[in-house]
Amino acid sequence: MPTTLQAPRKKVSKLRSALAIFSNSKSGSHSRLGTRVVGTLFGYRRGHVHLAFQEDPKSSPAFLVELATPTSVLVREMASGLVRIALECEKKTEKKGMKLIEEPIWRTYCNGKKCGYAMRRECGAEEWKVLGAVGPVSMGAGVLPETGNNETGSEGEVMYMRAKFERVVGSKDSEAFYMMNPDGHGGPELSIYLLRILVLKIEPSYREENHFVQRLAIPKLLFLRRDAQLQS
């Protein structure tokens, strides 16, 4: 009798081990990024820009947000040759353990201009479809044709730009991503900054508003040094 129960127990044990490995690998790959990452900007021509960072083209995006910036506006900015996108979120004491790339809401600035808010997104079927289509592209920009679906086709073709980025971690509250040009010259320069900042509400005597927001402890030194190296 014990010999007949031994095989099913082994099968159950193997199944549990396999499920544990799958679960751990899926959750681990979701939030892990190295010093070299794959960055993709994409969006429907009449829609908004999505920004994704992946460890490699086949891994789940560790960072995926939808910006309020229209795709057409970002295309015009990229044509200028130099684009800096800053994403800022508030530092909250009740979320001490949250990783920077897991923050859900960001204030967005593009070349110093306010561009609304960016929202963290889960990678759904539509996002995976785009990332899968551009998977073979190591660096470049282009347009994906419309699928003919009435729900998504109404926003036009999908425009994308894909490249390798160097990831620089300043602290647990600051990271920077610099687009890497294989030849070292030519093409647009794109830098993306993630900043988690402390926000204080105070009562000023010299303004009519009830309060204003003062930003503190923004770690700029790392990024200014890096930009100086790029310009030299």
Q: Can you name each region flagged by the protein language model?
A:
Residues 44-115:
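Short, well-structured hydrophobic secondary-structure segments
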Residues 1-68, 167-232:
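N-terminal low-complexity/intrinsically disordered pre-sequences and tails
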Residues 57, 64-68, 76-81, 98-99, ...:
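Surface-exposed beta-strand edges and their flanking turn/coil or helix-capping segments
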Residues 70-72, 83-86, 120, 127-128, ...:
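Short, low-complexity, polar/charged sequence segments that are solvent-exposed and flexible
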Residues 157-162, 189-190:
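Intrinsically disordered, low-complexity, charge-dense segments enriched in Lys/Arg
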Residues 106-109, 119, 161-163, 176-181, ...:
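Broad hydrophobic/π-residue packing in well-ordered secondary structure
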Residues 93-157:
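An exposed acidic His-Trp-rich patch
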Residues 59-61, 73-75, 94, 115-118, ...:
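Eukaryotic short linear interaction motifs
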